[in-house]
């Protein structure tokens, strides 16, 4: 019998070896604690006696739930701390970053007040038993190992600690050979998940399977009535599969049951495993109440799928799916789509979509991608796609691309085949986009260190658009565009001079269908034009240092290209460039390669910047104007009027960073007759406490042959109002049609362990005309609940704001981490 505290170091696997060595190995060195020679008189009944607690486990939980300002919390260096809305956080005895060694490799230190053999030959340790094993710690009042070293029994507030995890049980029975056993009346803490709970009994049925009976789980602060908790008759955790299964599960909010689920399958680690994902609930005015239950299928390490049965009360049953794959050396991709048979809100028509995307980086120089999209109708995405960033394109892209770059210095090339599905059946064939069957693009730039540079561009494509509705004569064929340019870049800190001489050419060959449609005679089916061009870009740089750094850059740009008649040339993909300050110094007034511009103009401009001592550009102002010496006779359409203006009006660009949080910008362009061609104003403010304000106004005058009218106001805000509450809104107002194309207003509450958002949204499909009597706005009211630690039941609001509110991600981060 030993009646003093003993301490030994040895290999610990299994627990029986530790106790047997402690009691029997005389060769192991011992050290004595300060209490050496004092016989333990601990009363186990007193140790088991519970202090009267307001809720089970109160004493245990409050011991490890500390204020964030506490020294032990500060030692975590802001890692693993709970959310900004929690005053306290869990701190377990062993840092979550500490990795425990395998039991058969770790060295252990065992201390106890008292050790002996009982009459049955069992090994017994009593009084403050501590087993410290390089990343693991066991504490108990008493530990007993049977004489066969097979069964271990620990009792008296048995604590097990390991990297970020801690449990306390009344008793533990464990089979050391099969690594199975039971833990009675256990409380547990997970620091990384900010979670805690209780289990009436924990059974380790195998080395990899643990079953919790009559168990609870919550990420709320410890208390008598947590904000929410999960209670289950049985929770089975399988480390081999990485999945957990609950049976007889109920969700409680403030001790009130609000949801019962007989069976639920969930992940317990980062592995992808088959199971049911979080259901999604919603409501809209044209779909009614809806429910989606995604099922994830982990088919193999390199591919998986998600199948989502979905029910919309006013439309019917729908099935959606997604398949993702990763090949060995041939890239990755995904396939997704959905089908809703006999939509009751859409004349009982079948609604469906299908999408395919594949990307393959063949090597450092070559890559390829393939994309295919299909939808049954133009309203599909606004009606049925639950994603807030769903497509609203009129034309769905289908393309294959082969890309080359980073090989030969200065060379980039692309070969692609591209076609489109036009969703709106009312669109005439003449207004549909051309298919490229195929298109080849090449850009090569080279030069020398002295500033001389050569550039070659080629764009060769066969454009095809069939005209089957007699809306126009067919105009399909091959277009070959070439450009060769030589420029000299002279740049110094004080000035720059960049002359450039280029030659551009277009060759067009109509195909047989177009020749037949237009009744072309021999020779007129082929068109060719060559245009030389000269440009000179020059400017000065002035700087003035003082309290603020000021820069002044006057700039002059001249461009000349002779007129070549291009009437009757097809326009495959070109549009008119928008007006801006930078566009004043660009000789190309068309986007695309269907026209070779005639030029003879001079643009003058000046830019001024003011920088403060921390580098903020407190003011940037630019003003410029173009002066034309000849009419611009080349137009996109033969019926377009020739531009005879002698000059543009002033083009102004202003911006200011008033401080690190507040930015304003304004742009405006006038025509020579004084009419305002376009203007926009934008204001951005992001506060340090989660507040945000955006305001924008955008106007475009209707100029035939150049630009369509556009007149809209966009505004958004996020504003904390009190404690954990904030309100948010977004509006896009179409002033041309005097209607709000989208309106969103919501309120959000965040607590330590749960959050709720309620918002209403009304919107029009981007492809619809609000003035049409057959078009009505879509309306939806959504309630979104997030149980932190379980994931959200819905995440649409965050996605909506992320895609519509500039700066949302940054401000949302400051809100949650404040």
Swiss-Prot record:
Signal peptide stretch: 1-33
One Gene Ontology cellular component annotation held by this UniProt entry: cell outer membrane
Keyword match Signal: yes
Domain of life, source organism: Bacteria
GO biological process assignments: Gram-negative-bacterium-type cell outer membrane assembly; lipopolysaccharide transport
The keyword Protease is annotated on this UniProt entry: no
Subcellular location: Cell outer membrane
InterPro entries linked: LipoPS_assembly_LptD, LptD, LptD_C, OstA-like_N
Alphabetical list of HAMAP family matching this protein: LPS_assembly_LptD
Function comment: Together with LptE, is involved in the assembly of lipopolysaccharide (LPS) at the surface of the outer membrane.
Similarity remark: Belongs to the LptD family.
Protein's recorded name: LPS-assembly protein LptD
Subunit structure: Component of the lipopolysaccharide transport and assembly complex. Interacts with LptE and LptA.
Disruption-associated phenotype: Non-essential under typical in vitro growth conditions. Loss of lptD causes impaired in vitro growth. Decreases LPS levels and susceptibility to polymyxin B, increases outer membrane permeability and hypersensitivity to hydrophobic antibiotics. Causes an accumulation of lipid IV(A). Deletion impairs cell envelope integrity more than the loss of LPS biosynthesis, presumably due to the accumulation of toxic intermediates.
């Amino acid at each position: 019998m030993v009646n003093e505290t003993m301490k030994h170091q040895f290999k610990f696997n299994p627990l029986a070896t530790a106790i047997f060595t402690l009691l029997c190995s005389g060769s192991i060195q011992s050290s004595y604690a300060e209490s050496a020679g004092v016989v333990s008189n601990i009363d186990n009944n007193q140790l088991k006696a519970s202090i009267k607690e307001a809720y089970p486990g109160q004493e245990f939980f409050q011991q490890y739930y500390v204020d964030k300002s506490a020294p032990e919390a500060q030692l975590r260096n802001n890692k693993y701390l709970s959310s900004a809305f929690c005053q306290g956080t869990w701190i377990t005895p062993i840092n979550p970053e500490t990795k425990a060694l395998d039991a058969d490799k770790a060295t252990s230190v065992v201390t106890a007040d008292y050790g002996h053999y009982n009459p049955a030959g069992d090994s017994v340790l009593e009084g403050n038993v501590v087993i410290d094993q390089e990343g693991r710690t066991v504490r108990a009042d008493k530990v007993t190992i049977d004489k066969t070293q097979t069964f271990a029994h620990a009792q008296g507030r048995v604590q097990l600690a390991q990297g970020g995890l801690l449990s306390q049980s009344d008793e533990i029975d464990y089979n050391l050979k099969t690594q199975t056993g039971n833990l009675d009346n256990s409380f547990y803490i997970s620091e990384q998940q900010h979670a805690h709970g209780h289990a009436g009994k924990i059974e380790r049925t195998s080395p990899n399977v643990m079953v919790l009976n009559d168990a609870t789980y919550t990420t709320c602060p410890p208390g008598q009535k947590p904000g929410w908790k999960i209670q289950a008759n049985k929770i089975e955790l399988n480390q081999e599969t990485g999945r957990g299964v609950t049976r007889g599960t109920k969700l409680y909010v403030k001790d009130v049951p609000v949801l019962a689920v007989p069976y639920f399958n969930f992940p317990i680690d980062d592995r992808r495993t088959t199971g049911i994902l979080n259901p999604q609930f919603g409501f809209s005015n044209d779909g009614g109440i809806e429910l989606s239950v995604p099922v994830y299928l982990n088919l193999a390490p390199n591919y998986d799928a998600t199948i989502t049965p979905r029910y919309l009360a006013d439309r019917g049953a729908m099935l959606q799916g997604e398949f993702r794959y990763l090949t060995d050396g041939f890239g990755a991709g995904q396939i997704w789509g959905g089908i809703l048979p006999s939509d009751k809100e859409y004349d009982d028509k079948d609604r469906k979509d299908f999408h395919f995307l594949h990307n393959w980086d063949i090597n450092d120089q070559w890559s390829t991608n393939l994309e295919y999209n299909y939808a049954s109708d133009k309203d599909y995405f606004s009606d049925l796609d639950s994603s807030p960033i769903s497509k609203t394109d009129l034309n769905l892209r289908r393309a294959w691309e082969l890309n080359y770059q980073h090989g030969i210095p200065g060379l980039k090339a692309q070969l692609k085949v591209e076609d489109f599905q036009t969703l709106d059946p009312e669109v005439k064939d003449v207004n549909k986009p051309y298919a490229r069957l195929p298109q080849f693009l090449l850009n090569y730039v080279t030069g020398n260190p002295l500033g001389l540079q050569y550039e070659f561009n080629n764009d060769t494509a066969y454009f095809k658009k069939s005209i089957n509705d007699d809306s126009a004569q067919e105009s399909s064929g091959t277009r070959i565009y070439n450009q060769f340019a030589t420029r000299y870049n002279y740049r110094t800190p004080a000035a720059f001079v960049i002359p450039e001489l280029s030659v551009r050419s277009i060759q067009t060959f109509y195909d047989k269908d177009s020749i037949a449609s237009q009744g072309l005679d021999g020779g007129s089916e082929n068109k060719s034009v060559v245009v030389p061009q000269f440009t000179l870009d020059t400017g000065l740089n002035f700087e003035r240092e003082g309290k603020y750094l000021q820069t002044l850059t006057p700039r002059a740009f001249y461009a000349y290209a002779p007129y070549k008649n291009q009437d009757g040339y097809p326009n495959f993909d070109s549009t008119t460039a928008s007006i801006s300050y930078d566009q004043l110094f660009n000789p190309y007034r068309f986007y695309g390669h269907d026209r070779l511009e005639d030029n003879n103009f001079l643009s003058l401009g000046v830019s001024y910047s003011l920088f403060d001592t921390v580098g903020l550009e407190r003011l940037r102002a630019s003003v410029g104007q173009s002066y034309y010496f000849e009419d611009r006779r080349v137009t996109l359409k033969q019926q377009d009027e020739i531009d005879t203006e002698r000059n543009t009006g002033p083009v102004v660009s202003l911006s200011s960073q008033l401080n690190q949080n507040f930015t304003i910008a304004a742009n405006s362009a006038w025509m020579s007759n004084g009419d305002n061609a376009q203007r926009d104003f934008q204001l951005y403010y992001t506060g340090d406490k989660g507040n945000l304000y955006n305001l924008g106004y955008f106007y475009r005058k209707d100029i035939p042959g150049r630009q369509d009218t556009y007149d809209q106001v966009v505004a958004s805000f996020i504003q904390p109002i009190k404690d954990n509450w904030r309100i948010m809104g977004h509006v896009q107002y179409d002033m041309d049609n005097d209607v709000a194309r989208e309106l969103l207003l919501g309120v959000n509450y965040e607590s330590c362990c749960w959050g709720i958002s309620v918002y209403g949204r009304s919107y029009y499909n981007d492809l619809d005309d609000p003035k049409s009597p057959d078009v009505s706005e879509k309306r939806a009211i959504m309630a979104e609940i997030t149980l932190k630690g379980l994931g959200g039941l819905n995440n649409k609001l965050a996605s909506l704001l992320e895609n519509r509110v500039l700066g949302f991600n940054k401000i949302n981060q400051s809100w949650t981490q404040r």
